[in-house]
A protein has these predicted regions:
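N-terminal helical cap/lid subdomain that shapes the substrate entry/recognition surface
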Residues: 6-103, 124
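Short glycine/serine/threonine/alanine-rich loop segments
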Residues: 48, 82, 113, 167, ...
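Flexible coil/turn residues that form the inter-helical turn or adjacent wing/linker of helix-turn-helix
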Residues: 69, 111, 178
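Asp-based, Mg2+/Mn2+-dependent phosphohydrolase catalytic module
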Residues: 1-16, 106, 122-123, 127-239
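Substrate-recognition element of Asp-dependent hydrolases with the DxDx(T/V) motif
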Residues: 82-96, 101-133, 141-145
Length: 239
């Protein structure tokens, strides 16, 4: 999606880059689709047991995890013989923001932060989510990895993103619930990285020892992290 001006922008503040599913939106929807509804629909379509369907899909998932295929509804429709995008639309009422999502975005907008939405969801999936939870007023850049040609786990994603939308990685912050994505961002040179302790309301909160990066749960906790970055920058400049 093209760059858009949001008005009250402070160029001295870091660009804030957000994942969508499991970060701004509750991952419970995706868990429902991929772990429950797709196995059920697959079993019905192929006249097999639910257990057989779950085993088949699990093998497919493991084969393609963290690739562009993993995030493509078109690919999965062809692979498993179920219209995966239609399946998501059938349960679109389950799409929901995480706690504090709009409270955070409203305040970031008021404070003049530049916010980018970077998702591995394909463009059709991004469109579906935005139709049901309108995040677009808060972001000057909204990117699906399908546009880039690499998923966020790969440093090539960040290289191509920078070519399309120039930015200084040292002046950026990335929030994502997936450690491999944060590793890709870190490899590219983004120093400020945060994860999410409970991406899905349907699963328990992850323990700090399970996570490789600093974590927040309620999204408004991000302000504590941003204040720490600001204070660190002040300390460096005055040293």
């Amino acid at each position: 999606m093209p760059l858009k001006s949001l008005g009250n922008i402070d160029p001295m503040k870091p660009i804030l880059m957000f994942d969508m599913d499991g970060t701004l939106l509750d991952l419970a929807f995706d868990d429902l689709i991929w772990n429950t509804k797709l196995p059920e629909r697959h079993a019905e379509t192929h006249d097999c047991s639910l257990e057989q369907s779950q085993a088949t899909l699990k093998a497919f998932y493991q084969q393609h995890n963290h690739t562009l295929c993993w995030y493509s509804s078109k690919y999965w429709t062809e692979k498993v013989g179920v219209d995966v995008l239609k399946l998501q639309y059938d349960f679109k009422n389950k799409i929901a923001p995480r706690i504090g999502c709009f409270e955070l975005l409203e305040e970031l907008k008021a404070q003049g932060y530049r916010c980018w939405l970077l998702t591995n969801a394909d463009q059709a999936g991004l469109k579906l989510k935005l139709e049901n939870v309108d995040l677009s007023p808060y972001f000057e850049v909204m990117i699906s990895s399908e546009e880039i040609g690499y998923s966020k786990e790969f440093v090539e994603f960040w290289q191509i993103l920078q070519q399309k939308h120039p930015f200084d990685p040292k002046h950026a912050c990335m929030v994502d619930d997936t450690a491999l994505v944060l590793k890709g961002a870190e490899q590219f040179g983004i120093p400020h990285l945060l994860t999410i302790s409970q991406p899905s309301s349907g699963r328990p909160e992850r323990h700090a020892l399970e996570m490789e990066y600093p974590a927040i749960n309620r999204l408004t906790e991000l302000f504590t992290f941003l204040n720490a970055i600001k204070n660190k920058d002040v300390d460096v400049k005055t040293a």
